[in-house]
A protein has these predicted regions:
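Short, intrinsically disordered/low-complexity patches at protein termini
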Residues: 92-96, 155-156, 205-207, 216, ...
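Short, well-ordered beta-strand elements
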Residues: 183-184, 192-211
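Short, gly/Ser/Thr-rich active-site loops of penicillin-recognizing serine hydrolases
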Residues: 177, 211-230
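Short, surface-exposed loop or secondary-structure junction motifs
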Residues: 1-189, 193
């Protein structure tokens, strides 16, 4: 998979998911490359892909005839009371955002940026909001009587896929303190994020850091040690 630099600083990218995937997947597309495709048959090999995550967002748009950001707002954020969570930079109060720090950010006046394939990592939120989503996952897709995922979807998020020893559907297992936890980490220019939980005790942790070179493993271990003693 080839890396594309389509970041838009200080604004939301004008390119839609439809335009992005036509440019990447169609042989006539501006960003088409055979390197973006696997030679393996579908459902035979697991290979992590950020573009694959964005493709799920595009599929949601095609099925629902609603943009992915609006679909999430109506079906996840509002039902769960996630009032500080947005895909779009234009809808986000900049004064409430932490400043991202990275040597790879070229424009210090507009350090916040977006990208066309935003479903794979363009969400802006806070720990309190995201904890509501995590609690819903822990509680089989439901929080305070509101169901955002089916139990079968949550089961798939906990189940190893295609022979992998770590990768499930979107989530994966990571070892801390010699113990496996389920969740997802993330990183962009100027940010490092971690969200994991113990599938046996249902203890979960979330950490945000406004530095893209942060090693948070020790903090993760300390938080799990604390949480599991409560």
């Amino acid at each position: 998979q080839e890396t594309l630099d389509l970041d838009c600083y200080g604004i939301d990218c004008a390119m839609t998911l439809d335009q992005f995937f036509k440019a990447v997947f169609l042989s006539s597309g501006q960003y088409y490359s055979s390197n973006n495709f696997s030679n393996n048959k579908p459902s035979t090999v697991e290979d992590y892909s950020n573009v694959g995550s964005a493709l799920i967002g595009y599929i949601v748009e095609r099925i629902t005839l609603t943009t992915f950001d609006i679909y999430c707002k109506n079906n996840i954020f509002i039902p769960l009371g996630m009032t500080k969570t947005e895909w779009r930079l234009a809808n986000t109060p900049i004064v409430e955002l932490a400043i991202p720090y990275s040597p790879d950010i070229p424009n210090s006046n507009n350090p916040h940026y977006t990208f066309p394939d935003y479903p794979n990592g363009g969400l802006r939120t806070n720990v309190l909001d995201l904890s509501k989503f995590l609690r819903a996952i822990i509680q089989n897709g439901t929080l305070n009587g509101t169901q955002i995922l089916t139990s079968s979807s949550v089961t798939a998020m906990k189940t190893l896929q295609f022979g992998s020893t770590t990768q499930c559907l979107s989530f994966y297992y990571e070892a801390f303190n010699g113990k496996n936890y389920l969740g997802h980490s993330g990183g962009e220019k100027g940010v490092t994020t971690e969200m994991y939980f113990d599938t046996n005790t249902n203890v979960g942790i979330i950490i945000f850091n406004n530095d893209d070179d942060a090693n948070l493993n020790n903090i993760i271990s300390l938080l799990f040690n604390y949480g599991e003693k409560q």
